[in-house]
Amino acid sequence: MPENLQLVIITGMSGAGKTVAVQSFEDMGYFCIDNLPPSLIPKFWELIKESGKVTKIALVIDLRSRTFFREIQDMLVELENTNFIDTTILFLDATDEELVSRYKETRRAHPMAMDGLVTEGIRKERAMLEEIKADAQLVIDTTDLSPRQLRERLNKELATRETHEFRVEMVSFGFKYGLPIDADIVMDVRFLPNPHYIDELRPLTGMDQPVYDYVMGFPETDEFYTKFIDLLRTVLPGYKKEGKSSVTIAIGCTGGQHRSVALTERVGAELKEEDYHVNITHRDRLKRKETVNRS
């Protein structure tokens, strides 16, 4: 039996990118099987044991059936006592609006839209997958990711898991554009003074020094920052202890241009100083400029 087997179970919303994920895992040297019923996994495992050659496995499994969900849970308990010592459930998600857009673009029927309404199919599927999403070690929101960006994200995630490195994903966002659906921790900083109402600061972002200094120049900002960092010093070790390879922290303001960007930069810098591996993404930082340019 090969040692250090890595098993990735790929699931998630229809249209969220599972096909791209499978292609990415194949490129990374994984043995991939698409839509294997959970009831056949024990037999598949026996074949893997007999071969002794496969060390990386990725399975795409349809978990819309509650029976399938129970089977996969039982299977994972069994695998905890085997050499599949690194089992990861990867859940791919996207906003309902983005999923509808993708289905319209491809003109495909949603597998759960019995009456032809894509929105109803998405609603049913999301409800059925709620449990497995909660149990997933890795949730990726593909709403704003191109296929190439999804491949890059998966490469990064898998590299982290293989080296057992704990990573913190910092994301700034604007509430007007929706919550990041893969966030583990969401913080609302709309209570802080808004640079948007200062004429010379309005066109800038939280990465520009004048905006950064403005946001950080208030006592309430210092108080919030100190308490939030203290909170993270408590919860991040807990996430790591529970076996998570990464945690996504989302900080939001109204438009995702000023306050959230500045705070995300500051919190990210502090966590780097404390030896966390940190990636920073400003999801909506330039969206206002893009809107102005299109109008």
UniProtKB/Swiss-Prot annotation:
NCBIfam families in the record: PRK05416.1
UniProt: GTP binding residues: D62, L63, R64, S65
GO MF term list: ATP binding; GTP binding
Keyword Magnesium on entry: no
Keywords assigned: ATP-binding, GTP-binding, Nucleotide-binding
Coiled coil: none
Pfam families reported in the protein's UniProt record: PapZ_C (PF22740), RapZ-like_N (PF03668)
Name by which UniProt lists this protein: Nucleotide-binding protein EF_0766
Family, similarity comment: Belongs to the RapZ-like family.
Function: Displays ATPase and GTPase activities.
Taxonomic path: Bacteria, Bacillati, Bacillota, Bacilli, Lactobacillales
InterPro entries in alphabetical order: P-loop_NTPase, RapZ-like, RapZ-like_N, RapZ_C
Residues reported to bind ATP: G12, M13, S14, G15, A16, G17, K18, T19
